[in-house]
């Protein structure tokens, strides 16, 4: 014989919940007395307090082994990469000469990018250094902070400086300037060279034919040793990365040209197939004319 369980009314259910939350007969709150709740809270307070103290101690010990200025571990790849400006999606520099909007965004990006290179700002923040030698600033047992940086003036970029330039870095005339910069690598030395230099060329034979002539600023694409070594963002507060500007004079219009630029120095390898940006950068250039 099946015994049916008596169905409780809504009022009975409410009364049971009220008694569970607070039982006036046993003075229990949610099934526990005040003493029981006090012991539970004390346990979790001690438990989580111990975990917090242990985490804080391990973090403090770890931070004692880490320098505020130089990373303890660095990338296995010691060769700096190259990148271009203006920064574009997929490294495609496309210019429609007759369409101002197509190149005005490039001009605005370059204006902002080159602003810290203004001669007045460089003279205020950085030093005039002796060219052809590394600008080393050892600590010698005492923290030498902040490190000084050498001036790289905007006027060194010649016809690509954008100073008094009505052609907007050449974009309005179909002779655009593309800027090459090296990524920063702490304590990087290029070798015994007097300088490094950037070279550019078409990736394939047909690209070389369509690329035409170009000029580089500073002359020959030189990057002087005085801008090295780099000591890190916190040490080198006002460090200014050296640039090389490439002005393309007569690119074949309406044709996509693949360009590759490389940095040449004794300690820079540009043939590492694992990293396509190690010491080099490839980009596409297209000048559309109607």
From Swiss-Prot:
Keyword check for Magnesium: no
Record-level GO BP terms: cell communication by electrical coupling involved in cardiac conduction; cell-substrate adhesion; intracellular potassium ion homeostasis; intracellular sodium ion homeostasis; lateral ventricle development; membrane repolarization; motor behavior; negative regulation of glial cell migration
Record's GO cellular component terms: apical plasma membrane; astrocyte end-foot; astrocyte projection; cell body membrane; cell periphery; cell projection membrane; cytoplasm; external side of plasma membrane
Entries under InterPro entries matching the protein: Na/K_ATPase_sub_beta, Na/K_ATPase_sub_beta_sf
Position of the signal peptide: none
Glycosylation sites recorded in the entry for this protein: 96, 118, 153, 159, 193, 197, 238
Ranges per topology, Extracellular: 68-290
Keywords: Cell adhesion, Cell membrane, Disulfide bond, Glycoprotein, Ion transport, Membrane, Potassium, Potassium transport, Signal-anchor, Sodium, Sodium transport, Sodium/potassium transport, Transmembrane, Transmembrane helix, Transport
Main location, first listed in the record: membrane
Region (immunoglobulin-like): 193-290
Cytoplasmic-side segments: 1-39
Subcellular location: Cell membrane
Residues passing through the membrane, by range: 40-67
Quaternary organization: The sodium/potassium-transporting ATPase is composed of a catalytic alpha subunit, an auxiliary non-catalytic beta subunit and an additional regulatory subunit. Interacts with isoform 2 of BSG.
Family the UniProt entry places it in: Belongs to the X(+)/potassium ATPases subunit beta family.
Known function: This is the non-catalytic component of the active enzyme, which catalyzes the hydrolysis of ATP coupled with the exchange of Na(+) and K(+) ions across the plasma membrane. The exact function of the beta-2 subunit is not known. Mediates cell adhesion of neurons and astrocytes, and promotes neurite outgrowth.
Domain notes: The C-terminal lobe folds into an immunoglobulin-like domain and mediates cell adhesion properties.
Name of this chain's protein: Sodium/potassium-transporting ATPase subunit beta-2
Organism field: Homo sapiens
